[in-house]
C-alpha cells in the first residue's frame, strides 16, 4: 500500500560536492564550489486531496536547515529542484566534523511545523578535484545517467548529444566528446557517423570512448562495422573482477595521470565490483598504455587506459568501469574523469 505522501527519489545520489580546498582552510572558506550543487527531489501525493507544505533539507546534525514550499495537487507527481545554499555553516560543516557532513537529509512537512511526515537521506561525497578552465563536454549517453550526473558534479559545461546532433552540429565547440559505455550497441546508428567523431579529434578535439564489448566495437565487415578507433584497437575477453586488484602506473609522468589532478594509489581504493571489462588485447603502437593490473594468478593487463595523439587532437579508450565508481561516489573516479575531460587543455 502506497503511503499518503512519498519522497520517491533524490538525484543525484550520492551527492558529490567538488571542493578543491577540502581540508585546507580551518575556517571553512571556499569549501563549496563556485556553483552550489543542485539536487532534484521527486515528490508523490498519493492522496485524493491536495497537500500544502514544505520540503526541509540540510546536512545531518547541522543547522540551519533550508525550507522550500510545495503545493501538490491530488495524486500529483512533482520534481522539485533545490540548491544547497553556499552558507558559512554549510561551507564549514565538512571541516568541523567530516563524519557528520557526509549525509544530506530531506523531509516533507506540513507548512510551519517541525514534525517530519517522511524523511530520506542521501550520502555526500566531498571531492578534492580540479578541472581545466573552459572545458565544454559533449557526450553521447549510454544506458544510465552516471556520466551526466558526474559531469554536473564536476561543475563543467556539458550537453547530451543525440546521434543526429553529432551528425549535423559543429563539434568543434566542444573541448571533449565522450562516447559513453556501450553506445555503439545502444545507438548503433552512431557507427555510420563515427568518422565525424574521428575528424573532430583529428582537428584538435579530445575524443573519449568508454568500455564496449567485443561484438560492439571490433571491426566486423559482416555487420558493416568499420574500425571505430583512429588506429588499430582490438578488444578481447579479458577482465579484472577483483575490485582491489593492484594498479601499476606504467607512465607515471604522463599528463593524463598528472593534470590537473595528480593521481595516486589512493584514487583506486574503495572501488566496487570490478576494475574493468573487455580489455584490449591488441593495439597500434600509437597508443600509450598508462595502467597495468591483474586478477590474482592472472597475467597483467595493460589496456585499461589507452591514449593516443591523433592529428591535432587526442583519442582515449578506457575499458575500466568508471561508471560503477562514479555512481558509487568513488572520489578517484571523479578525479580521473576530470583529467580525461581536461586532457589537451592548458
Describe the residue ranges of each PLM region.
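Short, aromatic- and glycine-rich surface loops/edge beta-strands on solvent-exposed regions
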Residues: 1, 55-57, 90-114
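Short, solvent-exposed loop/linker segments at the N-terminal edge
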Residues: 26-36
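Asparagine-centered strand-capping/turn motif at beta-strand->loop junctions
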Residues: 43-47
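Short acidic/proline- and small/hydrophobic-mixed sequence motifs that coincide with surface turns
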Residues: 48-53
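Intrinsically disordered, low-complexity Pro/Gly/Ser/Thr-rich segments with frequent PxxP/GP/PP motifs
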Residues: 62-90
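Aromatic-Pro/Gly-enriched surface loop or interdomain linker
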Residues: 100-180, 211-218, 232-234, 239, ...
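Catalytic beta-strand/loop cores that center a nucleophilic Ser/Cys/Thr
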Residues: 237-330, 335, 345
Amino acid at each position: 500500500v502506497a503511503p499518503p505522501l512519498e519522497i520517491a527519489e533524490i538525484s543525484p545520489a550520492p551527492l558529490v560536492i567538488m571542493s578543491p580546498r577540502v581540508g585546507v582552510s580551518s575556517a571553512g572558506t571556499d569549501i563549496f564550489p563556485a556553483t552550489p550543487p543542485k539536487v532534484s527531489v521527486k515528490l508523490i501525493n498519493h492522496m485524493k486531496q491536495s497537500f500544502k507544505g514544505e520540503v526541509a533539507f540540510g546536512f545531518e546534525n547541522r543547522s540551519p536547515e533550508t525550507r522550500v514550499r510545495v503545493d501538490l495537487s491530488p495524486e500529483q507527481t512533482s520534481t522539485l529542484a533545490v540548491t544547497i545554499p553556499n552558507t558559512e555553516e554549510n561551507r564549514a560543516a565538512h571541516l568541523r566534523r567530516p563524519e557528520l557532513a557526509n549525509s544530506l537529509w530531506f523531509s516533507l512537512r506540513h507548512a510551519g511545523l517541525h514534525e517530519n511526515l517522511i524523511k530520506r537521506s542521501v550520502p555526500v561525497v566531498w571531492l578534492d578535484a580540479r578541472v581545466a578552465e573552459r572545458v565544454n563536454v559533449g557526450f553521447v549517453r549510454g544506458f544510465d545517467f552516471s556520466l551526466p550526473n558526474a559531469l554536473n558534479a564536476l561543475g563543467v559545461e556539458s550537453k547530451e548529444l543525440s546521434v543526429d546532433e553529432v551528425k549535423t552540429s559543429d563539434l568543434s565547440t566542444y573541448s571533449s566528446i565522450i562516447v559513453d559505455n556501450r553506445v555503439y550497441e545502444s545507438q548503433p546508428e552512431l557507427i555510420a557517423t563515427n568518422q565525424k567523431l574521428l575528424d573532430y579529434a583529428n582537428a584538435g578535439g579530445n575524443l573519449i570512448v568508454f568500455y564496449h564489448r567485443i561484438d560492439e566495437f571490433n571491426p566486423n565487415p559482416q555487420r558493416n562495422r568499420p574500425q571505430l578507433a583512429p588506429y588499430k584497437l582490438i578488444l578481447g575477453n579479458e577482465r579484472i573482477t577483483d575490485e582491489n586488484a593492484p594498479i601499476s602506473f606504467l607512465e607515471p609522468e604522463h599528463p593524463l595521470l598528472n593534470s590537473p589532478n595528480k593521481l595516486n594509489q589512493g584514487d583506486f581504493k574503495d572501488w566496487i565490483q570490478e576494475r574493468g571489462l573487455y580489455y584490449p588485447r591488441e593495439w597500434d603502437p600509437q597508443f600509450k598504455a598508462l595502467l597495468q593490473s591483474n586478477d590474482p594468478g592472472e597475467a597483467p593487463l595493460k589496456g585499461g587506459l589507452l591514449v593516443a595523439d591523433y592529428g591535432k587532437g587526442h583519442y582515449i579508450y578506457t575499458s575500466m568501469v568508471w561508471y560503477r565508481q562514479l555512481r558509487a561516489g568513488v572520489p578517484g573516479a571523479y578525479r580521473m574523469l576530470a583529467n580525461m575531460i581536461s586532457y589537451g587543455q592548458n
